[in-house]
Swiss-Prot record:
InterPro entries: Antitermination_sf, Antitermntn, HSP_DnaJ_Cys-rich_dom_sf. It comes from Salmonella phage P22 (Bacteriophage P22). It comes from the Viruses. A zinc finger (unnamed) spans 118-147. Residues 1-28 are annotated as: Disordered. GO terms for biological process: DNA-templated transcription termination; transcription antitermination. Keywords: DNA-binding, Host-virus interaction, Metal-binding, Transcription, Transcription regulation, Transcription termination, Zinc, Zinc-finger. Residues 171-192 bind DNA. Zn(2+) binds at C118, C121, C144, C147. This is Antitermination protein Q.
């Protein structure tokens, strides 16, 4: 069972869950099986499970839990980022909260997010390669140049920067780009890593 099935489980079309064809109905996962598997996955990959469930609007509580996990991670690695490491006390905590909140919002973004779908590829991640299409006389596609193949626009890092300047008024754009934004980017990546970990664990416990 993969993580995608967790979202389906919360509004199932049938009482049995399965990602692939099974030999018999008894080979499918019952609701009890799924809940038990989710519990095991949450105990081993709480961050990833909370991140995924929050992203799919399964629980507002999971959203906040995911941001809290992300803040803990940010605090742990903040020493690597000069623009954050030098901050003290309450200011640092607030900056980490802002970074975690914006990073989680970026992780949650998809082509289904209102207003986020790429205008060029309409969410497919693919666009017509005009030059090659004319050269070969048939439609040739390429990775969409606007969205880089993801099908949607990311949360602008500039929005996080503006929010941070409310806490650090003298933070310039160049300093942000060099010393703070790398942490923001790392937080987005960490969300995807934690989801992957949770997905692997859930798959392992349901084999």
């Amino acid at each position: 069972m993969r993580l995608e099935s967790v979202a389906k489980f919360h509004s199932p079309k049938s009482p049995m869950m399965s990602d692939s064809p099974r030999a018999t109905a008894s080979d499918s996962l019952s609701g009890t099986d799924v809940m038990a598997a989710m519990g095991m996955a949450q105990s081993q990959a709480g961050f990833g499970m909370a991140a995924f469930c929050g992203k799919h609007e399964l629980s507002q509580n999971d959203k906040q839990k995911a941001i809290n996990y992300l803040m803990q991670f940010a605090h742990k690695v903040s020493g690597k980022y000069p623009g954050v490491a030098k901050l003290e006390g309450n200011t640092k905590a607030k900056v980490l909260q802002v970074l975690a909140t914006f990073a989680y919002a970026d992780y949650c973004r998809s082509a289904a997010t209102p207003g986020a779908r790429c205008r060029d590829c309409h969410g497919t991640g693919r666009a017509v390669d005009i030059a090659k299409t004319e050269q070969w006389g048939r439609v040739v596609e390429k990775v969409c140049g606007r969205c880089k193949g993801v099908g949607y626009s990311k949360v602008p890092a500039s929005a996080a920067y503006r929010a941070i300047t409310m806490l650090i008024p003298n933070l310039t754009q160049p300093t942000w780009s060099r010393t703070v934004k790398p942490l923001y980017d790392a937080l987005v990546v960490q969300c995807h890593k934690e989801e992957s970990i949770a997905d692997n664990i859930l798959n392992a416990v349901t084999r």
